[in-house]
From Swiss-Prot:
Pfam hit, one: Herpes_ORF11
Top-level taxon of the source organism: Viruses
GN (gene name): ORF10
Protein name (Swiss-Prot/TrEMBL): Protein ORF10
Length: 418
């Protein structure tokens, strides 16, 4: 069985193996102009074209049929396993648009020889799905003795065996970015799954609709089957009341990951659902400098039979304004994400800026040479290294199924774009 194939696409040599693409630059010299620590490089092909137009994976019509561990995330990372000592490094990122040309951030000067080639991998990760997670309902938010029960949202238990409950009504503003409301639950809640959340607009001073864009939601018990939902919005607004609806389902017991909040999810082209990561505060970064942004994503692991879990936080590969360095968020810990401004002018990161995405993976001790925030893919071991940790092949990790690979006889190159 032929498990590896190589072809040339413009200025790049591409090797396909185990549902992984390893890309190596062929051009020496002015491949790009380096104006600082990191330079943006637009690769003249898309992931969709690599998958559909250039390679054949066994007898299946699409690579998706080979990714047997479930829904996946496409990741680009450096392929030089040198522990961050190489002269040029490709910053890792999540590819969430398969149809547009791939963009990467490269640190260091353009290569002058073939030995200095830019080399990166595009591979697939199968993170733990939302069904392995549940949201904790906090205790201790009881109303003061003698206080009147607050006006509650309308709760309607859906006529389904899964006991889903629809909650509708208006949330009230308690601060420019925080909205709260109370609701009754048909059953006591210790954990829940937030299935959907929809904002139908706000009533602000002018009366114009202004929907909420939640950063995360928390739930607190305030009485007997009485609960408070708090929506933390991504930006300030003059809205006093917000019309919302959400559907939740009680969870009888803790799951593998117990989240301290319900966060918005981004669906990848291959069906995985990852958390959108927002900063806790607004910051302005001077040109060619870095800053740290505190992020809110608290969780605990309930049992570790399958291994230790963590959230791997990555920037988006399509981001053109800043570079988010990878981070590994451990249970019960706060994390700060390091962001670099490659521009020649100050850059302001707003509270509603998505600075990365978080996916839950099983982690293992990595190589001593891999230093944070460096990240690379080890093609020999078929494993992904992020800082001091390693994500191996398997569910909750890298998806690299062996298969027959061949180059399409009728393949065509895409137009080169700089």
């Amino acid at each position: 069985m032929q498990t590896e194939a190589t072809f040339i696409l413009g200025d790049w040599e591409i090797t396909v193996s185990n549902c992984r693409f390893t890309c190596s630059s062929l051009t020496c010299g002015p491949l790009y102009r380096s104006s600082g620590d990191y330079t943006r490089l637009r690769i003249p092909f898309s992931l969709d074209r690599l998958i559909r137009d250039h390679a054949i994976f066994g007898l299946v019509p699409n690579i998706e049929d080979l990714l047997t561990h479930g829904s996946c995330v496409a990741v680009v990372a450096d392929a030089n396993a040198t522990g961050g000592n190489a002269r040029r490094i490709v910053a890792p990122g999540v590819i969430n648009n398969f149809s547009e040309p791939i963009g990467i951030w490269v640190r260091g000067p353009p290569p002058q020889t073939r030995k200095e080639a830019i080399k990166f991998c595009i591979f697939f990760v199968s993170p733990l799905p939302p069904r392995e997670m549940t949201t904790y309902v906090f205790k201790g938010g009881d109303l003061p003795p003698g206080a009147e029960e607050p006006e509650t949202l309308h709760s309607a238990e859906a006529p389904l065996p899964s006991r889903e409950t629809l909650v509708t009504g208006q949330l009230r503003s308690t601060s420019p970015r925080t909205y709260t409301g109370y609701f009754h639950s048909p059953v006591p809640l210790s954990f829940l799954d937030l299935l959907t959340f929809e904002s139908m607009g706000c009533e602000n001073v002018e009366g114009d609709p202004e929907p909420l864009t939640p950063k995360y939601l928390t739930f607190t018990q305030t009485g007997e089957r009485l609960y408070k939902v708090t929506v933390h919005n991504t930006h300030s607004t003059a809205c006093k009341k917000a019309r919302i609806r959400f559907v939740y389902r009680p969870t009888p017991s803790a799951r593998q990951l117990v989240m301290g909040q319900a966060s918005p999810l981004i669906t990848t082209p291959l069906g995985a659902r990852v958390f959108a990561v927002y900063p806790d505060c607004e910051k302005t970064i001077p040109p060619q400098e870095t800053t740290t942004l505190r992020i809110q994503l608290l969780f605990e692991q309930h049992g570790a039979n399958a291994g230790e879990c963590a959230f791997v936080i990555m920037g988006l590969a399509r981001e053109t304004k800043f570079v988010s360095f990878p981070a590994v968020l451990l249970p019960g810990k706060h994390e700060h994400l390091t962001v670099f401004n490659p521009q020649t002018h100050p850059l302001t990161i707003q509270r509603d800026t998505i600075v990365g995405v978080a996916m839950a993976c099983y982690i293992h001790p990595g190589k001593a040479a891999s230093q944070a925030p460096y990240s690379f893919y080890d093609c020999k071991e078929e494993s992904w290294h992020v800082g001091l940790f390693q994500i191996k092949h398997g569910p909750g990790g890298v998806c690299t199924p062996p298969c027959h690979v061949a180059i399409r006889a009728d393949r065509h190159e895409e137009p080169m774009q700089s």
